[in-house]
A protein has these predicted regions:
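Conserved ankyrin/ankyrin-like repeat signature
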Residues: 34, 68, 72, 104-105, ...
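Leucine-rich solenoid repeat scaffolds
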Residues: 145, 150-170
Length: 170
């Protein structure tokens, strides 16, 4: 098509940004290369209706995801994800790793300087959750205490990890 000289033709390709729902599906696929490629154009700070970011989703669906934790979490952090970001219920990635009993993810988050004492909406810390879930393996409790978690932080009901441990005889 010949246009008059006073008309400028602009050809713009608009690339649709992936939503967090799109990325959740990508994360569940078994194609790591495609996921990493898709991650390039993704706004890592996006959240779903529960306030979950992609790291929260990864942790809660860990058993269904084939992508290696170290690589994925490292990429999320490189893209600018705040590992201390909270869901609407106040749970952080570290809290979720304790709740889901995922030692490998827990260690990665500890080594990435996750905040040990952030409280959820009920005032519970990751250490409180570790004490509550204790079933004979003290890994999470030991690691949190060794790394400086405060056992005396009380939740909204006045219960600290230390007092909880005494109450349930842990």
């Amino acid at each position: 098509v010949d246009y008059p000289p006073d008309i400028i033709v602009v050809n713009i390709r608009i690339k649709k940004m992936k939503t967090i729902e799109d990325m959740k599906l990508e994360l569940l696929s078994d194609n790591s290369n495609k996921f990493m490629q898709t991650l390039i154009d993704y706004d890592i700070k996006s959240k779903d209706k529960y306030g979950s970011n992609l790291l929260h989703y990864y942790i809660m669906n860990y058993d269904s995801i084939v992508h290696p934790a170290g690589v994925i979490i490292s990429e999320f952090i490189k893209k600018g994800l705040d590992i201390n970001d909270k869901r609407k219920d106040g749970r952080t990635a570290l809290y979720l790793s304790v709740q889901c009993q995922l030692q490998d993810i827990f260690e990665i988050l500890l080594n990435s300087n996750a905040d040990l004492d952030i409280q959820n909406v009920n005032g519970n810390t990751p250490l409180w959750e570790a004490v509550m879930r204790y079933r004979g393996d003290g890994f999470f409790i030991e690691q949190l205490l060794k790394n400086g978690a405060n056992p005396d932080i009380k939740n909204n009901y006045g219960v600290s990890p230390k007092s909880l441990a005494r109450t349930i005889a842990n």
